[in-house]
A protein has these predicted regions:
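Short beta-strand-to-loop capping motifs
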Residues: 65, 148-152, 221-223
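Conserved small-domain helix->loop->beta segment predominantly found in fold-type I
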Residues: 94-106, 114-216
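A cross-family glycoside hydrolase active-site/sugar-binding cleft signature
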Residues: 20-24, 149, 220
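Well-ordered, non-membrane alpha-helical segments in soluble/globular domains
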Residues: 1-5, 70-73, 111-115, 158-179, ...
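PLP-dependent enzyme catalytic core of the Aspartate aminotransferase-like
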Residues: 1-15, 193-241
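Structural preference for beta-strand elements that scaffold enzyme active sites
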Residues: 18, 43-44, 145, 216-218
């Protein structure tokens, strides 16, 4: 579909489109190298540096183009300079320090997340979990964030929703209270240590209409955290409901 030639209404060749890919959640995947998925079309990939690239130490990100779109990088550079939106020297230094370990951190964070997801499935099978399938993970898509829809009860939809929201906060508050040096109420992802929790399960809370928000828990795990402690506290939560 992406490589299909586009025509204008006069049946002349249209301007070739540019495919823009947000790789914030999978910066370790090579989509645009020779022979890869997006090598045959003009494509630009960008990553939020505040996530895995820097481990949360800075907000500067980066973008790259494949060979077909390489000419566009000069325009992107001009735009960043005009808007005074280039990375600072300190941000570049932080990215240079953290990027060499990024792929390893992604792999280890995924291992922790898969372990926690499997544990939740074991001790609270009624919960609904949205996490990458093991089939996709084998292809290299190894995120370390999942959403958790806790089981609820009540005589009406409103009662069920209110009860679930109470459980959400009960779980998160318990995690923060019992593991204050690791668990945080935070919407970010790709951190160097600890576990981040947030509700609703979206990083675009400010741009989502209230009626479209899904009040379920989102958890983001890191490569450096006490997994046994988190499992113990989750078990305590299960025993309390």
């Amino acid at each position: 579909v992406l490589t299909k030639e586009r025509k204008t209404k006069n049946n002349t060749s249209a301007i070739e489109p540019v495919f823009i890919l947000d790789q914030t959640f999978c910066p370790n995947i090579r989509f645009m190298g020779k022979g890869e998925t997006l090598s045959a079309v003009k494509a630009i990939s960008y990553v939020s540096g505040s996530k895995f690239p820097s481990g949360g130490l800075c907000t500067a990100g980066y973008c790259v183009a494949n060979e077909k779109a390489a000419e566009l990088m000069k325009d992107i550079e001009t735009h960043l300079k005009l808007c005074n939106n280039e990375a600072t020297t300190l941000q570049v230094q932080l990215l240079a320090k953290q990027l060499p370990s990024m792929n390893q951190r992604i792999s280890e964070a995924y291992i922790n997340t898969r372990r926690f997801v499997n544990y939740i499935k074991k001790v609270l099978p009624e919960a609904k979990i949205n996490f990458v399938s093991e089939e996709l993970a084998k292809e290299g898509y190894t995120p370390s964030v999942f959403s958790l829809d806790l089981p609820t009860k009540g005589g009406s939809d409103k009662e069920k929703e209110n009860y679930k929201r109470e459980l959400n906060l009960q779980l998160i508050n318990l995690m923060i209270q019992e593991i204050p040096n690791e668990s945080k109420f935070c919407v970010s992802y790709g951190q160097l240590k600890g576990c981040y929790w947030t509700i609703p399960a979206t990083s675009t809370q400010g741009t989502t209409k209230e009626e479209d928000k899904d009040y379920i828990v989102r958890a983001s795990l890191s490569p450096n955290m006490d997994m046994e402690r988190h499992e113990d506290i989750f078990m305590a939560f299960v025993n309390s409901i």
